[in-house]
A protein has these predicted regions:
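Hydrophobic helical membrane-anchoring modules
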Residues: 179-180, 186-212
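A short, N-terminal amphipathic alpha-helix
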Residues: 28-45, 52, 56
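N-terminal nucleotide-binding beta1-loop-alpha1 segment
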Residues: 1-16
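Conserved core of the sugar-phosphate nucleotidyltransferase
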Residues: 76-81, 103-185
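Short phosphate-binding loop-to-helix
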Residues: 46, 52-96, 104-112
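Short internal beta-strands
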Residues: 45-49, 127-128
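Short, high-confidence coil segments that cap the C-terminus of an alpha-helix
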Residues: 42, 92, 121-123
Length: 212
């Protein structure tokens, strides 16, 4: 079974109640729920939350809700422990993590990531981008951006992981597959500025669709 999971706790600090904050006419969480529901590859999809209001919003937008223990909703709670809690209660061979804080996904992105995972059989797959930033003064001279090879950074949009790996307490594994996305999909809402960026990008996408 391929299980999609969106963790959505209620206690976000830098941007309070961000998971249900309205973004271009819908709660932030709803954008991810809609993308998950459009997937043809997910066998089951759940939202994990301890928060009654978030649970109600998730159900309103058509998601199945799995009640999360309050002990797994604190600031120090790891994503791994949240996913392990879900796997302790639901069967799965493959886990697809879809974070509510990444609302911008091209149509079909989730299924393309799952299909890449099935074709290559890695331990884990992550979407992201190539970062070419270097610390100032870190070398004998400052390289031009085009001369820097860069390194892969995950962006929080889509993760696909072998469920057994997670059960063993690992999230990444040894064999990793990368899916490079255009920068407009790399949004990960953590604070008010991130939310503002997400709004502008989403508005632009909606205008492009309306004009097409």
């Amino acid at each position: 079974m391929i299980l999609g999971i969106t963790p959505a706790r209620g206690g976000s600090k830098r941007l309070p109640r961000k998971n249900i904050k309205p973004l271009c006419g819908k709660p932030l969480l709803a954008w991810t729920i809609e993308a998950a529901k459009a997937s043809k590859r997910l066998d089951r999809y759940v939202v994990s939350t301890e928060d009654a209001e978030i649970a109600a919003v998730a159900r309103q937008w058509g998601a199945e809700v799995l009640d999360r223990p309050a002990a797994l909703a604190g600031d120090e709670t790891t994503m791994l422990s949240v996913i392990q809690d879900v796997l302790a209660r639901l069967p799965a061979e493959i886990v697809v993590l879809l974070q509510a804080t990444s609302p911008i996904r091209d149509e079909g992105l989730i299924d393309r990531c799952i299909e890449r995972f099935l074709a290559t059989q890695p331990d884990s797959l992550a979407s992201g981008f190539i970062c070419k930033l270097t610390p100032y003064g870190s070398g004998p001279r400052q390289l031009r951006c085009q001369d820097v090879a860069g390194f892969f950074c995950d962006d929080g949009n889509v993760y696909v992981v072998q469920a057994e790996l997670i059960r063993r307490g690992d999230w990444v594994g040894a064999r990793i597959e990368q899916v490079i996305l255009d920068r407009a999909q790399n949004v990960d809402v953590d604070d008010a500025f991130d939310f503002w960026v997400a709004e502008r990008l989403m508005e632009q996408r909606q205008q492009c669709r309306a004009g097409s």
